[in-house]
């Protein structure tokens, strides 16, 4: 005896209720931060992932102009060995 799969029994996947997301605000536009110097490693680390990659705009919430400036600043800091190019990957 074979079982027939009834499509009415299945639940659609990924069709849950959508939560409204809080819009990301560019911290440079509101004056919270300023791209002043490549030597400010503490500020630059906010825009670098744990593995050392530059975070994309959708994660940082920066405008296109500020994303380009922060990327250039991070690259300068990497060349001067203030920031690492990659972090050591630790598998758990």
Swiss-Prot record:
GO BP field: translation
MF (Gene Ontology): small ribosomal subunit rRNA binding; structural constituent of ribosome
Highest rank taxon of the organism: Bacteria
Family classification: Belongs to the bacterial ribosomal protein bS18 family.
InterPro entries: Ribosomal_bS18, Ribosomal_bS18_sf
Record's subunit section: Part of the 30S ribosomal subunit. Forms a tight heterodimer with protein bS6.
Disordered: annotated span: 1-27
Function: Binds as a heterodimer with protein bS6 to the central domain of the 16S rRNA, where it helps stabilize the platform of the 30S subunit.
Biased composition (Basic residues): 12-22
Keywords of the record: Ribonucleoprotein, Ribosomal protein, RNA-binding, rRNA-binding
Gene Ontology cellular-component terms listed: cytosolic small ribosomal subunit
Protein name per Swiss-Prot or TrEMBL: Small ribosomal subunit protein bS18
SUPFAM superfamilies linked to this entry: Ribosomal protein S18
Chain segments annotated as coiled-coil in the UniProt record: none
Keyword Flavoprotein: no
């Amino acid at each position: 005896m074979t079982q027939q799969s009834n499509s009415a029994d299945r639940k659609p996947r990924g069709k849950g209720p959508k939560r409204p997301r809080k819009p990301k605000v560019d911290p440079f536009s509101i004056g919270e931060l300023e791209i002043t110097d490549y030597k400010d490693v503490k500020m630059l680390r906010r825009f670098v992932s744990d593995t050392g990659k530059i975070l994309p705009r959708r994660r940082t919430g920066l405008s296109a102009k500020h994303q380009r400036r922060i990327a250039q600043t991070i690259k300068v800091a990497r060349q001067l060995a203030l920031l690492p190019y990659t972090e050591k990957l630790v598998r758990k």
